[in-house]
Amino acid sequence: CIRDRTNLQLQKDRENLLLSAGVDKNYLKPHYTCEICKDKGYTDGKICSCRTELLKKFASEELSYKTPLKLSSFEDFSLSYYPTEKYGNGISPRERMKGVYEFCREYAADFSTESPNLFMYGETGLGKTHLSLAIANEVIKKGFSVVYDSAQNLFTRLEKERFGREGGNTEDTVLYCDLLILDDLGAEFDTKYVLSEIYNIINSRISYGRPTVISSNAALDELTGLYGARVTSRIIGDYELILFEGRDVRQIKKRLSK
């Protein structure tokens, strides 16, 4: 009809004016971050994936912000604190930790939601927290949602929310974030609730295909006594086992600073 032809001509004239002024002809058209929902957050009456991802990112940032630890980097991890003397297995702690360092760095660089689960174990002060924080730092830079917290802080928060002493959706955030890093899983968590929650988190994230990194001071032969057969079976069967060896780096640094 005449009106349609007039509108088309007006649009063409406007585009020509913009082009003659050196401006892109699409300058006046809206530019959306999400072309699926046109930045409305919903499509076909359902929450758009962009909104879900944004909420997930905010939730993980808020939860990780509550940890008292600062993100570390691979650059400030030093192998010089690890002994060069060979142990009974014919490998020195420095050689082993060089391999651990390179593995963790590659893990972070190549991270995807299909990356394997990691169980870092060994005595206290050997760099488990440092390298897990370095992984978190790099994975966050790649745009993935990361939740990092100590086991004690996390299970305390989950318990308060579960029994109504605090509000929040920590459990959903923990279960569905791209990467969960659970630091310092120790022997002090021996209540039925905590043991049940440990299994729920580990098992659920395996089912959802979401990678998890756990660090612990416990030896492998102590796992069943600490966490039960179900948790131990999941860790042994579904996690890459990363042994940390050496002397307590924190104590060495403390002595050197005097």
Model regions and ranges:
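Short, small-residue-biased leader/transition segments that mark boundaries at the very start
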Residues: C1-I2
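Interdomain "pre-motor" coupling segment immediately N-terminal to P-loop NTPase/helicase cores
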Residues: G22-S72
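Pre-Walker A (pre-P-loop) alpha-helix and adjacent loop at the N terminus of AAA/AAA+ ATPase modules
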Residues: K70-L118
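Walker A/P-loop nucleotide-binding motif
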Residues: E114-L131
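Loop/turn-to-beta-strand initiation segments
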Residues: P116, F144-S145, Y176-L179, Y208-I214
